A protein has these predicted regions:
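Conserved small/polar residues in nucleotide/adenosyl-binding loops
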Residues: 316-318
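Active-site activation/catalytic loop segments of kinase-like enzymes and analogous catalytic loops
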Residues: 247-281, 296-313
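A cross-family kinase active-site recognition segment
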Residues: 129-186, 211
Length: 318
């Protein structure tokens, strides 16, 4: 394993913040009362809390100490842009009492950036999967929603849109350095084959495709569905993995997670593709790359999860 392979924001511990500290921080963004409730939420690299008062609910987000301000400004500006370009149900950035979206606070002895976004009603797809009756309609809805989100982000740019991100498809080849972290020999060989396929086939074809800022993380934890109709997507959260990348990779990420769940690349992709294409026409060259990119994302997930396990890091949201 290459000891030079490093992504500090994933390796540094999440901020040390308890419920009381979170409530103290939240009062700068919302009116609290004696009945206010703090609920810790799972997260990959930062610390998030659901803050509930009699008036509203909101999400307090405390960044990892190693997170760069410019990356968080990029995410905030993207949310503000989407407020103007789409009617989709998405988190909205909230200003604090001083009119700021992002502030620096000492949290657990470290300086961290703190912000707040609105809470979205809906049920995470991962929590309701067992009662899904019509996966076809679900996938059509997911594809359609993602396409609308892509259209909303089209034309948006930011100085930090190319920030280093381990989940960037463009970083695929860097994962050769940590293949040794996969203990199971068969899994390691399969992962290596996937990386070689990307290197020798997918990479060049992908370089010719359309690029724009994408969400890059349509996984079942981030997809919100209706309680009344769990096949209908009503919102999407977590814009922490956004970056400038090939547009088709946004759909490939969604297909990868659905493929894992249905154990079939075809059934995990076909209706997502149809739903997406019905709203935002894909080029033939993009559609042809979809299976390769979904396969690549599955391999990335395996390799990254094994790397994080080898460093005793949290595996949440892999």
């Amino acid at each position: 394993m290459n000891s030079n392979f490093s992504f500090p924001v994933l390796e540094h511990p999440a901020p040390n913040c308890d419920n009381k500290n979170a409530l103290d921080l939240a009062k700068d963004w919302m009116q609290l009362d004696q009945n206010s409730i703090v609920t810790p939420l799972v997260s990959e690299r930062d610390r998030n809390f659901l803050i509930s008062s009699n008036q509203e609910k909101a999400i307090l987000k405390i960044s990892n100490h190693k997170e760069e301000r410019g990356v968080l400004e990029f995410q905030t500006e993207a949310l503000l842009h989407l407020q103007k370009t789409t009617s989709l149900n998405l988190p909205r950035a909230k200003k604090n009492i001083d009119g700021e979206y992002l502030v620096t606070k000492n949290v657990g002895g470290e300086d961290c950036f703190v912000r707040m976004v609105t809470y979205l009603e809906g049920i995470p797809l991962d929590d309701i999967r067992a009662v899904i009756i019509d996966p076809k309609m679900l996938h059509l809805s997911m594809g359609n929603f993602l396409a609308k989100l892509g259209k909303g982000l089209d034309g948006f740019s930011h100085p930090n849109q190319n920030h280093p991100l381990l989940w960037d498809v463009g970083k695929t080849e860097s994962l050769f350095d940590v293949l040794g972290g996969i203990q199971d020999e068969q899994k390691r060989k399969m992962a290596e084959l996937a990386l070689l396929y990307y290197q020798n086939n997918t990479k060049e074809l992908l370089s010719e495709q359309r690029k724009q800022i994408i969400h890059n993380d349509m996984n079942p934890d981030n997809v919100l569905v209706s309680k009344e109709d769990p096949s209908s997507v009503v919102g999407m959260i977590d814009f922490g993995d956004m970056l400038y990348a090939p547009l088709i990779n946004d759909l490939a990420v969604a297909c990868a997670y659905e493929t894992i769940r249905v154990e079939s690349l075809y059934s995990g992709s076909k209706d997502l593709l149809l739903g997406y294409h019905s709203e935002n026409n894909l080029l033939e060259s993009e559609a042809m790359l979809l299976p390769m990119l979904a396969y690549n994302r599955i391999a990335m997930s395996l390799i990254i999860s094994e790397w994080r396990a080898s460093k005793h890091l949290s595996l949440i949201h892999i």
